[in-house]
């Protein structure tokens, strides 16, 4: 039986693991132009370079389970801290794009594995009654980083400090993880390998996986290019632009908390159609208005109403098989991560050819496709009732 202090320590590690990944992903759009000038390359090429971060996160999904069978969780976290120091030092002292790309890939793998450990800890330490709420609370730390770190990044850039100090500050998150890790006893967690195969890899799961991929791709494409768009075309400062990003993630976090309590009272299929439709409408509004105060209200609303879409997709996917399967959920999570990976691969060439606003239009189109996909899904499938 794990004692209370260890439980608190392990839970804090889980929270911080999501905060780490959130910090790395959500700051990109804020200093994209600044860092492209540092390396003297076009902004679209710089955006493509950040694909190495997303590729590292995607790679971590495939290697985390294998590593856990060889190296215990505590050792993984200690080793991750050492690699974080190395990657950060490379960013600070090397003025080389190749080394920058390697560091991004390293940070992607480190954060991805650390986040997998965080999820693994929560799902194994908490019972069915508290697991869902703890996972939701853990996931909200990703959004919390999306509120805090864009503001920190904007302050660093606006005060003429070098961009790499942002990564130094992000590294402090892993320092805290490291300090908690060395003072916490990790339980031996055994994994059960289910021999049952999922035979229902049907249209419904395929439809939901595509929806997850396109939703994350649309969301991150929008939030990555939106700061640059607003600074160039609406002529606002980097601080105002960062506040828009933070407002989105703040509303996203609040939305996750609120929807976690009210979703059980509504039909999930009708809810996801409603939320995706509202999100599509709000993003369309953002793309046609130029008033900062109005855009702030729109992006707050967009963050709130889109916050539950990904969670509902995962929940609906788990209901498409006779028994809720980790394999099904992992399939949806992988699809979402692929969406993350494709963010700059897809939008970079589009921005280079058609301009920054085209990235926002692509995001709008992707949200439109998700809206129609969930309508098709709801029309053609039946959903199991949710059992507490």
From Swiss-Prot:
InterPro entries: MFS, MFS_dom, MFS_trans_sf, MFS_TsgA, MFS_TsgA-like. Belongs to the major facilitator superfamily. TsgA family. One of its GO terms (cellular component) is plasma membrane. It is found in: Cell membrane. GO terms for molecular function: transmembrane transporter activity. The lineage of its organism: Bacteria, Pseudomonadati, Pseudomonadota, Gammaproteobacteria, Enterobacterales. This is Protein TsgA homolog. PROSITE patterns: MFS (PS50850). It comes from Buchnera aphidicola subsp. Baizongia pistaciae (strain Bp). The chain crosses the membrane at residues 12-32, 51-71, 77-97, 102-122, 137-157, 163-183, 203-223, 246-266, 272-292, 294-314, 331-351, 356-376. It comes from the Bacteria. Its main location: membrane. Keywords: Cell membrane, Membrane, Transmembrane, Transmembrane helix. It is a multi-pass membrane protein.
């Amino acid at each position: 039986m794990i004692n209370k202090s260890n439980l608190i320590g392990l839970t804090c590690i889980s929270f911080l693991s999501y905060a780490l990944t959130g910090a790395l992903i959500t700051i990109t759009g804020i200093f994209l132009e600044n860092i492209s000038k540092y390396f003297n390359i076009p902004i679209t090429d710089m955006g493509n370079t950040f694909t190495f971060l997303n590729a590292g996160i995607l790679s971590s999904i495939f290697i985390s389970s294998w590593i856990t069978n060889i190296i215990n969780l505590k050792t993984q976290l200690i080793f991750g801290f050492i690699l974080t120091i190395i990657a950060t030092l490379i960013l600070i002292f090397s003025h080389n794009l190749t080394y920058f790309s390697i560091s991004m890939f390293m940070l992607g793998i480190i954060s991805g594995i650390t986040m997998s450990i965080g999820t693994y800890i929560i799902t194994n330490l908490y019972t069915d009654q508290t697991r869902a709420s703890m996972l939701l609370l853990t996931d909200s730390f990703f959004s919390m980083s999306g509120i805090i770190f864009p503001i920190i990044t904007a302050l660093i850039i606006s005060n003429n400090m070098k961009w790499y100090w942002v990564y130094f500050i992000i590294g402090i998150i892993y320092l805290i993880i490291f300090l908690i890790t060395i003072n916490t006893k990790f339980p031996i967690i055994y994994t059960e390998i289910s021999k049952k195969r999922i035979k229902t890899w049907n249209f419904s799961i395929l439809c939901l996986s595509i929806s997850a991929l396109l939703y994350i791709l649309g969301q991150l494409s929008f939030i990555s290019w939106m700061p640059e768009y607003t600074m160039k075309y609406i002529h606002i400062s980097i601080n105002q632009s960062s506040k828009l990003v933070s407002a989105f993630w703040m509303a996203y976090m609040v939305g996750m908390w609120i929807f976690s309590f009210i979703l059980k009272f509504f039909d999930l299929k009708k809810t996801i159609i409603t939320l995706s439709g509202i999100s599509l409408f709000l993003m369309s509004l953002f793309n046609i208005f130029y008033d900062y105060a109005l855009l702030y209200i729109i992006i707050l609303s967009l963050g709130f109403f889109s916050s539950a879409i990904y969670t509902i997709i995962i929940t609906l996917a788990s209901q498409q098989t006779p028994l809720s399967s980790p394999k099904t959920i992992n399939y949806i999570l992988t699809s979402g991560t692929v969406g993350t990976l494709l963010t700059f691969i897809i939008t970079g060439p589009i921005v280079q050819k058609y301009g920054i606003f085209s990235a926002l239009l692509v995001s709008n189109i992707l949200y439109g496709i998700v809206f129609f996909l969930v309508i098709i899904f709801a029309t053609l499938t039946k959903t199991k009732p949710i059992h507490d």
